Regions:
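Short beta-strands and strand-coil junctions in structured, solvent-facing domains, enriched
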Residues: 3-4, 18-20, 37-42, 59-62, ...
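N-terminal periplasmic accessory domains that precede
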Residues: 1, 14, 47-70, 142-144
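Extracytoplasmic
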Residues: 6-8, 26-28, 37, 47-51, ...
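Surface-exposed loop/interface segments of Gram-negative outer-membrane beta-barrel transport/assembly proteins
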Residues: 60-125, 136, 166-173, 177-263, ...
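Short, glycine-/polar-rich solvent-exposed loops and beta-turns at beta-strand/coil boundaries
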Residues: 23-26, 43-48, 171-174, 208-210
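Outer-membrane beta-barrel architecture
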Residues: 53, 67, 143-147, 158, ...
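Short acidic/polar hinge/loop motifs at secondary-structure boundaries
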Residues: 9, 14-41
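Outer-membrane beta-barrel strand-turn architecture
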Residues: 149-152, 184-188, 270-276
């Protein structure tokens, strides 16, 4: 869901604001969505774009059970824009010039060479998207959980791993999750709940020496003309003013991020009467991220250079303690 400024809905996990990216999908029991005005009344201005309520799995009374699940898959672009070929571009350019009363820019022989690929270095027809999306996009997911307890104490603990290879070179994600949920009823009137979760996420993505970041690579791939060769006959790169996006991929320059996220939630509820109770809840959130971006210089050809080498590093640390009485 998104509105102005690409705003996202608020995510509440077991009563505390969190991120869906840090969850193991195997730990989710239920998901519900609030979109009416009541959500803003309950959660404030952050809920203006709706609220996603996530409940994680809890322990059940009974003999301890161990469960393992795994799945595997591959990703590919579902739909890509179709761009004109070099021959089509040349033909359309000539037509536009004819409407303007100008002479053709391309001869019939040149258009034919663009179309038949007989001289790919001088009359290229580069499919930049084919050069970008070269990887399998293999992904895997594993989760093992233990569930059990009795009427007094119940527990659910799980360990998960998600591995995801990108559909472009040097793009990957590895995520590890650990969760422990414990529920207890020491007396008929007292109920306690405790949850602690931890996620460790490692991300890698290609960057570039032009302005840095992955977004610029996608931008240039969707802008550069098919008439620009990926490489020339002498092995140097064809370029536009901004460079060559596939040359950036070839440089093996990457941004690497490591994220650590921990969330602990505890609550106590005392019921005086079936209709009257008091509940206290406290939570602690910790987030840390290390980001390193290596921008490598590149000599595309004798006349075009981007550089010099640069290393960008950013460290982030945040923690938060919250409490409520309801």
């Amino acid at each position: 869901t998104g509105t102005f400024n690409n705003a996202n809905p608020m995510v509440i996990v077991d009563g505390v604001e969190a991120s869906m990216n840090d969850l193991d999908p195997n730990d989710i029991q239920s998901v519900s969505v609030l979109k009416d005005a009541a959500s803003s009344a309950i959660y404030g201005s952050k809920a203006a774009n709706g609220v996603i309520l996530v409940t994680t799995k809890r322990g059940k009374a009974g003999k301890a059970s161990i469960n393992y699940s795994a799945n595997f898959g591959w990703q590919s672009p579902t739909e890509l824009p179709e761009y004109v070929t070099s021959a089509q571009y040349a033909t359309l350019t000539n037509e536009a010039r004819a409407y303007a009363g100008k002479t053709p820019l391309y001869t019939a022989e040149q258009i034919q060479k663009y179309a038949d690929g007989s001289d790919p270095y001088n009359y290229p027809n580069t499919n930049w998207q084919d050069l970008l999306y070269t990887e399998s996009g293999f992904q895997q997911q594993h989760n093992i959980s233990i569930n059990g307890g009795d009427e007094k104490v119940r527990y659910m603990t799980s360990v998960g791993y998600q591995g995801q290879d990108g559909i472009i070179k040097h793009a990957s994600k590895d995520q590890y999750n650990v969760r422990v949920n414990v529920d207890a009823n020491p007396t008929s009137k007292l109920e306690s709940n405790f949850s602690i979760s931890y996620s460790n996420i490692a991300l890698e993505e290609p960057t570039n020496p032009y302005v840095g970041g992955l977004a610029q690579i996608f931008r240039q791939v969707n802008m550069i003309s098919p008439m620009v060769p990926y490489k020339k006959e002498d092995g140097t790169y064809g370029t536009i003013g901004d460079g060559n996006p596939i040359a950036w991929i070839d440089m093996d320059a990457t941004t690497n991020k490591k994220r650590h996220n921990m969330l602990g939630v505890g609550s106590l509820k005392y019921s005086f009467l079936p209709e009257l109770s008091i509940k206290g809840q406290a939570s602690y959130k910790l987030y840390a991220e290390d980001s390193n971006e290596m921008r490598k210089d590149i000599q595309y050809n004798p006349n075009k250079y981007h550089g010099p080498n640069q290393m960008w590093q950013k460290d982030t640390f945040e923690d938060q303690v919250m409490g409520d009485i309801m």
